[in-house]
């Protein structure tokens, strides 16, 4: 808690530093009567299109200005304010709740400065870091300085605007802390219940902004892309979409992407409803889609980006799936209790998740990005200046640089103002005291890291979809095994089931109903033709069946035959049914007894053995006597043969005697 106390102490000092200070401005070259605050004409505007931000040594800075006020301007004033004391002081000044004192000023006459073809004006002003000289801006100490730029016509201020510069000492070696900009490409589901997908204008525009941002930003960023949106973009028949897809893949080279489920899901609700296995399948599908569509791009599968609050039960399961890092967006940080500020990497409380890191996007910076005003240059500079102020606060409060993770993003992760983020990234890149990196990979934590306490279990559900999703999953896993591995229906059905559990989809029942209709359509393409009865004249034989496949591709099934008075020597093999044809199948059987009895024939899926057709019942006749009956029959046959032999011999004796019964001929010697 020491770090939190130190930050609170800094915040108290901010109240004094940010208090309104009225300092008379003596503008060089004007009369004493002009030393007070000039009149302000509020109708005109002035915007900063480009400016320097980092100042290491004295520099002739150039500010490119635009706006309606420039048409009647004769001078531009630069008012350098007292440097900000800390982040709270910075926000009070940036949000116009406080006006800091002016420590230096410079006036530039613009009547001799050539204007651009677009009416812009590039105004030079010297920022001096060594000494104060006439008509320059002296920034004596390192820190973030507010700078007011105002346009005047004589004594009348036509317009003014606020920006910041960051003065750093090149001789001082600062302690670097990690920082990253997080950007996410997502949007409403692009698939329909009938299996088709369409990229609408909003999704296309979001993708263009995302790609343009990647092409312009030179530093490392943390990225996540919705696999479902990427899938639709890759399959779009529009030539411009194909070009956009290739631009995206080119812009991602050398970067990594955080894996995600195929569409946005609520892991807490799925865990509550007992759908942990479905959550696992959703993530596997999303990861497989990214790997298939982004070959050569590193897919980070160890980080989970949470947009809604998590509980300990869900975090424990995510850890079992291999997630070792959590990124909490502003919506996911609600209800958690922290031992340290959100900028400090932490771990979930409890021993079950001790090696899972927790990082949080900055809530205040997210609010700034969500309501970004002014030009991209001004918004980007403000973001960079606030990040540096936050960094200085953390270091001053004693935070270990290795434990700091500054994550900049909008509230949703979407690129609300990509141009401003580009300016911020460029301003922060190679800034003293900061190290810009991709935070999508694993972040090492130990028990020494502070804890973040999550609720034990949250009561969010999918609203009664549990049974429908479970039943659809069982049917899908079984029936898709009937198709060849490369059949596109396999992927389409998996995608439909994934979309049905997304909280952003209002017509989830239509996706499930459409999926089950497709599954039934495939099973209906298989028909079974059986004889009404069969006759077996020996102990073993075969049952001959015919299967017809009316589908356009080969279909695979198994034949399951059962009877209480028959044995089936072989397990049912997978049978390939050729498209549009009839296949004859012979099932080996072995009779246990003779007589008439029913034989039930079922056609089932290769996996899961889900019934494909209605069962057929065949009457079997077994006429062969087996076992003891065969022994008795042989014995009777032998008796019959013996009787016949005896009868034959008696007949021979009656007709002329049996030669075997006549005495031997010859002389018998006397005894």
Predicted regions and their residues:
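Active-site beta->alpha N-cap acidic-glycine motif
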Residues: 156-250
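Intrinsically disordered, low-complexity Pro/Gly/Ser/Thr-rich segments with frequent PxxP/GP/PP motifs
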Residues: 99-135, 569-594
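Cytoplasmic C-terminal tails of single-pass
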Residues: 652-671
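Membrane-proximal extracellular "stem/stalk" segments
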Residues: 487, 505-626
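Terminal connector regions
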Residues: 131-163, 511, 593-632, 636, ...
């Amino acid at each position: 808690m020491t770090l939190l106390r130190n930050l609170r102490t800094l915040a108290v000092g901010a109240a004094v530093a940010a208090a309104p200070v009225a300092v008379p401005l003596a503008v060089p070259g004007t009369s004493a009567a002009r030393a007070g605050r000039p009149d302000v004409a509020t109708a005109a505007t002035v915007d900063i299109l480009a400016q320097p931000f980092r100042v290491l040594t004295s520099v002739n800075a150039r500010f490119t200005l635009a706006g309606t006020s420039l048409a009647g301007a004769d001078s531009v004033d630069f008012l350098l304010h007292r440097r900000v004391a800390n982040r709270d002081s910075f926000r009070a000044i940036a949000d116009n709740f406080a006006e800091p004192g002016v420590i230096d000023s410079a006036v530039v006459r613009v009547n001799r400065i050539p204007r651009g073809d677009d009416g812009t004006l590039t105004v030079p002003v010297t920022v001096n870091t060594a000494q104060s000289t006439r008509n320059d801006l002296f920034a004596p100490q390192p820190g973030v300085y507010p700078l007011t730029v105002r346009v005047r016509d004589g004594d009348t201020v036509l317009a003014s605007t606020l920006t910041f510069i960051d003065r750093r000492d090149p001789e001082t070696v600062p302690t670097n802390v990690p920082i990253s900009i997080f950007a996410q490409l997502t949007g409403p589901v692009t698939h329909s219940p009938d299996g088709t997908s369409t990229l609408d204008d909003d999704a296309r525009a979001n993708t263009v902004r995302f790609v343009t941002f990647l092409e312009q930003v030179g530093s490392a960023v943390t990225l996540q892309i919705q696999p479902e949106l990427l899938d639709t973009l890759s399959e779009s028949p529009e030539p411009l979409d194909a070009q956009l897809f290739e631009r995206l893949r080119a812009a991602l080279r050398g970067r990594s992407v955080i894996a995600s489920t195929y569409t946005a899901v609520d892991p807490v609700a799925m865990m509550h409803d007992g759908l942990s296995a479905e959550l696992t399948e959703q993530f596997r599908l999303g990861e497989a889609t990214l790997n298939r569509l982004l070959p050569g791009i590193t897919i980070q599968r160890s980080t989970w980006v949470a947009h809604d609050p998590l509980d300990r039960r869900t975090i424990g399961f995510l850890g079992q799936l291999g997630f070792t890092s959590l990124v909490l967006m502003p919506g996911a940080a609600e209800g958690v209790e922290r031992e340290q500020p959100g900028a400090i990497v932490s771990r979930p409380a409890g021993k079950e998740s001790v090696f899972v890191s927790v990082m949080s996007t900055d809530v205040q910076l997210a609010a700034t990005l969500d309501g970004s005003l002014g030009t991209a240059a001004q918004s980007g500079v403000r973001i960079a200046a606030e990040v540096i102020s936050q960094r200085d606060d953390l270091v001053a409060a004693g935070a270990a640089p290795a434990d700091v993770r500054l994550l900049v993003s909008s509230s949703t992760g979407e690129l609300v103002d990509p141009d401003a983020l580009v300016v911020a990234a460029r301003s922060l890149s190679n800034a003293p005291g900061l190290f810009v990196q991709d935070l999508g990979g694993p972040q090492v934590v130990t028990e020494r890291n502070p804890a973040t306490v999550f609720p034990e279990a949250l009561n969010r559900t999918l609203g009664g979809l549990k049974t429908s999703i479970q039943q659809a999953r069982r049917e899908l896993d079984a029936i898709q095994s009937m198709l060849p591995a490369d059949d596109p229906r396999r992927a389409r059905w998996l995608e439909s089931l994934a979309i049905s559990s997304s909280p952003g989809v209002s017509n989830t029942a239509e996706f499930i109903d459409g999926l089950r209709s497709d599954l039934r359509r495939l099973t209906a393409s298989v028909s079974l033709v059986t004889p009404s009865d069969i006759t077996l004249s020996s102990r073993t034989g075969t049952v001959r069946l015919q299967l017809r496949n009316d589908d356009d591709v080969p279909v695979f099934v198994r034949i399951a035959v059962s009877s209480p008075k028959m044995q089936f020597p072989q397990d049912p093999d997978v049978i390939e049914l050729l498209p549009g044809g009839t296949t004859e199948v012979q099932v080996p059987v072995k009779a246990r007894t003779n007589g008439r009895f029913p034989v039930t024939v079922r056609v089932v899926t290769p996996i899961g053995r889900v019934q494909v057709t209605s069962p057929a019942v065949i009457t079997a006749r077994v006429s062969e006597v087996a076992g003891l009956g065969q022994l008795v029959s042989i014995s009777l046959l032998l008796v019959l043969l013996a009787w016949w032999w005896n009868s034959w011999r008696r007949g021979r004796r009656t007709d002329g005697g049996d030669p075997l019964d006549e005495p031997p001929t010859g002389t018998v010697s006397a005894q």
